[in-house]
Regions:
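Alpha-helical transmembrane segments of multi-pass small-molecule/ion transporters
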Residues: 1-316
Length: 316
């Protein structure tokens, strides 16, 4: 019974968390008595989101066995593809500065430059793939993001070249620890706190999943608030949705194409297609136009629905 309950929770946690987040947004937006608490609660929640990202990455890195991971050729090709796509989007955004739906392009950039999700290996294993090889890519993907995000985002913020270095340092100061500190702590836990490491792999093996669920509520509420106050037109909303779907298709499509040359279609598809959207949404909300975070939120929906479809088809 417990196993069935767990499966039910895993199946429906995405829509439930997003519905709860949406209802929380409505509650504090429409109930007049609660309006006075909206800003204090927002200020309280803001530091919780990056903390959740750190906990999720720490839990994922605790499961990674460095000694069993080997660099693969397709890792390099995917990283190069990610970098090229990021630079192309930066070029388009900077060239078409007055583009009406610029927020959609910036949202697409945040999705492209984002790291691989910790759950990519789990999904790949359910599709007949190999979890360890994706864990290796997840490490290098996160390491690259710690550098590329601070380098690229200041270029599209539109605040002039004189502010580039200051923005680079600011974003680096915030993003680098979120990615690197969990990895360092996970390695220290393995080396010096073996009982805690064993505990993380057994009793707390699903910690990242539940933290992800909780953070999804907070992220959804904040994204809904941003969309509501942005007064989006139908065309603008469609532009954001189109950007999210297009990036998701490109991610999974290119991943599978690159993987097909190395007989790693499933692994490469998941490694490149499934991104850490909680992290991407946090980056979009913090360092770009908040409307851009809607693209990452929609991307998260699309990638999860696509993976659910793949798993159902694979099990037939």
């Amino acid at each position: 019974m417990a196993i069935n309950l767990k499966k039910i929770i895993e199946m429906y946690v995405l829509p439930v968390s997003m519905v709860v987040g949406f209802l929380a947004f409505l509650l504090f937006e429409k109930v007049q008595v609660l309006e006075q608490y909206r800003r204090p609660i927002s200020n309280f929640v803001n530091p919780i989101i990056p903390a959740c990202v750190c906990v999720m990455l720490y839990s994922a890195f605790c499961k990674v066995q460095l000694e069993k991971m080997k660099p693969r050729k397709w890792h390099l090709y995917l990283l190069m593809t990610q970098l090229v796509l990021s630079l192309v989007l930066v070029g388009i955004i900077t060239f078409f500065k007055d583009f009406t739906y610029k927020e959609a392009l910036i949202g697409a950039l945040v999705c492209v430059v984002g790291p691989t999700a910790a759950s990519a290996g789990v999904v790949a294993s359910k599709l007949g793939g190999e979890e360890s090889t994706i864990s290796g890519f997840m490490l290098v993907s996160n390491a690259m993001c710690a550098v590329t995000i601070p380098l690229l985002l200041p270029l599209v913020n539109g605040r002039g070249e004189s502010h580039f270095f200051l923005e680079f340092l600011n974003i680096l100061r915030m993003v680098f620890p979120i990615i690197i500190v969990p990895f360092v702590l996970a390695q220290l836990t393995k080396l010096y706190f073996k009982r805690l490491h064993h505990f993380m792999l057994t009793e707390f093996k699903d910690l990242a999943f539940y933290v992800w669920s909780a953070s999804l509520v907070l992220i959804t509420a904040r994204a809904c608030s941003n969309a509501y106050h942005a007064n989006l037109t139908l065309i603008s909303a469609l532009a954001l949705l189109t950007a999210a779907v297009a990036v998701c298709i490109v991610h999974f499509g290119l991943g599978r194409v690159v993987g097909s040359f190395f007989n790693e279609k499933v692994n490469a598809g998941q490694a490149f297609g499934q991104r850490n959207m909680i992290f991407c949404i946090y980056v979009a909300l913090t360092y770009t136009d908040p409307i851009s975070s809607i693209v990452a939120t929609l991307h998260m929906l699309v990638q999860n629905f696509y993976n659910s479809y793949q798993i159902i088809e694979y099990k037939k």
